[in-house]
């Protein structure tokens, strides 16, 4: 069997579930919880969603991203509730828990220079030994231009800029 499980990554692992669901779904949930709870995670690769109006508001992931909001003086830090930020924090948590590993995401690039992302950058610098970021730019709102003066275009058909991020511990 290919080790792919149906689960919400941004939810904390739960104790093994009972028979509330059909056996196959219960078995799937139990196996996913075992992976999340007891298996060392050494490499996380993905392209998390960029959703500023996230519906992923579970207590576990919210408590993890609270680290990124600590000591901020801004009145609003909604940008830190974006799903891609939660997935970066999710990956950071598991790599920290393991003591070593690689987190590789293509994501929204606003954390690179966002004012409200200061603590996020600080925590990432404290967690990882090496950080490599390839800023692909492409943010339509910034109206950036290429070195030759042409309009900067996104690699995807989206308004938000993109970066390829590699975090190594």
Language-model segment annotations:
Residues 1-133, 143:
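SAM-dependent methyltransferase catalytic region
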Residues 136:
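Short, ordered loop/turn segments at secondary-structure junctions
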Residues 147-149:
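Conserved active-site and SAM-binding loop architecture
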Residues 151-156:
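Conserved RecA-like P-loop NTPase helicase motor core
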Residues 157-169:
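Conserved beta strand-loop-helix elements of the APE1-like EEP
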């Amino acid at each position: 069997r290919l080790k792919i499980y149906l689960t919400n990554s941004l939810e904390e692992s739960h104790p093994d579930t009972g028979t509330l669901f059909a056996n196959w779904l219960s078995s799937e949930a139990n196996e996913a919880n075992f992976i999340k709870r007891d298996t060392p995670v050494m490499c996380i690769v993905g392209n998390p969603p960029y959703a500023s109006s996230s519906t992923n508001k579970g207590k576990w992931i919210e408590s993890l991203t609270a680290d990124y909001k600590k000591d901020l003086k801004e009145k609003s830090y909604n940008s830190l509730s974006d799903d891609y930020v939660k997935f970066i924090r999710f990956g950071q948590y598991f790599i920290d828990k393991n003591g070593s590993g690689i987190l590789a995401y293509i994501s929204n690039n606003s954390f690179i220079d966002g004012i409200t992302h200061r603590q996020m950058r600080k925590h990432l610098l404290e967690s990882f030994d090496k950080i490599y970021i390839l800023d692909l730019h492409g943010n339509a709102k910034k109206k950036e231009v290429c070195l030759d003066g042409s309009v900067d275009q996104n690699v995807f058909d989206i308004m938000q800029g993109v970066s390829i991020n590699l975090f190594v511990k």
